[in-house]
Amino acid sequence: MRLLALFFLALAGSASAQKAPYDVFPEAAPPYYRVRYEASDKPGELVYPVNYTVWVPPGVKALRGVIVHQHGCGEGSCKSGLTGAFDLHWQALAKKHDCALLAPSYEQPDKAECQMWCDPRNGSSAAFQKGLVDLGAQSGHPELSKVPWALWGHSGGGHWAGGMVLMHPERVAAAWLRSGVPLLEANPSRSTIKTHTVPETALSVPIMCNLGTKEGVTVKEGRFAGAWASNEAFFTAVRSRGGLIGVSVDPFTAHECGNQRYLAMPWLDACLTARLPETSGEPLKAMPAEKAWLAPLLGTEAAPAAKFSEDKTKAVWLPNEAIAKAWAQYVKDSAVTDTTPPPAPTKVKIKGNEITWEAGADLESGIASFTIERDGVAIGSVPEKSANPYGRPIFQGLQYSDTPVQPLVKMVFTDTKAEAGGKHTYRVIAVNTVGLQSK
């Protein structure tokens, strides 16, 4: 109780300061919806304010699920959640499966205890489910409160997503845990973290433990060097009981997300395709065991489960052949291949010398940029220069916790060299992150 009282004192003493950095975020106009809850001083409830933003695919008749993109700990990561629902690439995955895309932003103060939200038992599970009810009412999709969840989490968000699997396995279609997992055995050096138990029903939920090689796999020192020990312990405990769990190690990164989305998207796509019921309200379907592939832990080659000769209870589980091949490429150089061009931009409009358009992302490789042609000749690109310190260049930019940068990049180009009064034909071409162009 004393620890909880200290949290409330810290919050009360800095309440006015908590408007920043959480007070700057994109407008939520349909198909975006937002709810925000203040901090609670009631035992067991969420002690931090939280902002939930959801995107609902335009025209969807009935939602079949919700994809949750959960940030990590600390102010920098928490505020990055404010743009998560606006990510065009994650929207492409959601749209394919008639799912909503939801991104929380827990307003954790600087240096405050992350466990007070990233352990879902501390009120964030209940707040999340209340958010689904309220957002369902706002959007006209009350089924949002009942559909299955596909969870993605980074760092403390991985801890949260894994905890939600263990608390609500019947609701979770799949969970991708980037650099964070629930603790199953007490760690004396991290006494604020409470342990979880793994129920039998959680063993049928597909889980991927994903982390960087510099988080204790090959680099044994540094702030995040303990991540591998936690991931290995969680993987071993779940897999030894037959759980559907894998491990994928980014060969270049530390705690930053890097290029993980190019494996996470296909992996979640495969799991949602296999598990989502055709009719909303029906139970999740089981993963087809006959399609599974296995690989040695920290290995680089996978094989069909029926042909895997090593101990299967210690092997990385992969849902099918296509994902096994993408996984092998990812753990080698993170360059997951793609041979499909992105969708062509639509609703291209010219007003004076300003060109605007709309575009959806390529599910496999997202959007890197747009090329603008005037009369068949390229005259510029948006953005002019694409820089991403954490992985492939992305049109919307990429923050540490895998969300677009603010302010959101607009789909607009000004032709400053067009002849006044001249008639021109313009074309906008989408370019994905492997360099393929729309047709």
Locate predicted features.
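Short substrate-entry loop that stabilizes the transition state in hydrolases
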Residues: 60-112, 184-185, 217-219
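Alpha/beta-hydrolase-fold serine-hydrolase catalytic core, especially in secreted/extracellular enzymes
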Residues: 241-243, 251-346
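Pro/Thr/Ser/Gly-rich low-complexity, intrinsically disordered linker/stalk tracts
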Residues: 328-366, 420, 434-439
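Recognizes extended acidic, P/S/T-rich segments that occur
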Residues: 369-421
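The feature captures the conserved acid-bearing segment of alpha/beta-hydrolase catalytic domains
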Residues: 173-261
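Alpha/beta-hydrolase active-site loop
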Residues: 116-143
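A domain-start/cap signature at the N-terminus of enzymes
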Residues: 17-66, 97, 149, 154-164, ...
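Beta-strand-rich modules
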Residues: 415-436
